[in-house]
UniProtKB/Swiss-Prot annotation:
Its EC number is 6.3.1.17, 6.3.2.41. InterPro entries: ATP-grasp, ATP-grasp_RimK-type, ATP_grasp_subdomain_1, Rp_bS6_RimK/Lys_biosynth_LsyX. Mg(2+) 2 binds at residues 277, 279. Residues 325-361 are annotated as: Disordered. It is found in: Cytoplasm. This is Beta-citrylglutamate synthase B. Belongs to the RimK family. Catalyzes the synthesis of beta-citryl-L-glutamate and N-acetyl-L-aspartyl-L-glutamate. Beta-citryl-L-glutamate is synthesized more efficiently than N-acetyl-L-aspartyl-L-glutamate. It comes from Mus musculus. It comes from the Eukaryota. It catalyses: citrate + L-glutamate + ATP = beta-citrylglutamate + ADP + phosphate + H(+); N-acetyl-L-aspartate + L-glutamate + ATP = N-acetyl-L-aspartyl-L-glutamate + ADP + phosphate + H(+).
Amino acid sequence: MCSSVTGKLWFLTDRRIREDYPQKEILRALKAKCCEEELDFRAVVMDEMVLTVEQGNLGLRISGELISAYPQVVVVRVPTPWVQSDSDITVLRHLEKMGCRLMNRPQAILNCVNKFWTFQELAGHGVPLPDTFSYGGHENFAKMIDEAEVLEFPMVVKNTRGHRGKAVFLARDKHHLADLSHLIRHEAPYLFQKYIKESHGRDVRVIVVGGRVVGTMLRCSTDGRMQSNCSLGGVGMMCSLSEQGKQLAIQVSNILGTDVCGIDLLMKDDGSFCVCEANANVGFIAFDKACNLDVAGIIADYAASLLPAGRLTRRMSLLSVVSTASETSEPELGPPASAAVDNMSASSSSVDSDPESTTEREMLTKLPGGLFNMNQLLANEIKLLVE
């Protein structure tokens, strides 16, 4: 911890995911930022916390220690597929009620926990969404087969709590859907969604931090399946995005109330987009590699900027420079499906490959010259300040 502390910032996560890449990277970045900015920092695991109401006031203990000075900002990373309102959200509500600024806030996390809840929030705001049906109760899947037929086959079927492309099916017809009803697990309801054929096996992952698009990645399936998730073997490459696509991603993040959000956009033949999903606990191992970014560092800078002193750190101020320059230097995404796929086959490699591998180095050298290395840009700016 550094001296002359000017603020207090915590990193709160769950024991089940704290050793995963995003959490380890965010922890690294927050420690570095807090030392650089002379901030008081603490990393906390959810199950170490005891919430109290004593003499009519909210309180907090961590591993038996009574906490007397609370953080001004808490960076939250919880496993959204398993978030429970009676435990995880209770902890986040407690901190929020005590005056802590959470990123993301509990309501924003809830808006993204359930895929249909996400669509409920976005509906009525002019956001392009695939037609989608769902139901109440856990045993009504079979009853929905006739109701959802108006969406036409093939149709997309998803568990509302699924993640990383799991529990997602493309139902060919009613018979196939009936067969699925006997095989699926019913812990959470499913949704039935209109199939966007032209985006089969392809989507655009957009990461938004603090209302700014920090990067975009085109993801493509390598085995013909509908899902393009890198965790399922898909490949990704940095891409530019049209202004319409960027504004759509920002609009979605704003409506959902997220500080950090991963938004997946489906592509149509006319170059427009519709929203597939939003993730408040977005992973970025593939994103960092494909886009040559340090997303954790951007998150840490934004967290520091939320402290009462109101400092906008240098990295966050440079994001607008990068965004503006990339708009003038990069070709926009939005060509017909075949063109994007051809580009992918010529320029991408598996994002799960060794970062030092020849294939990935070749991929990076083939990227358009106008694409930016955020870390290099920052290093150059800092060098100018020192000199």
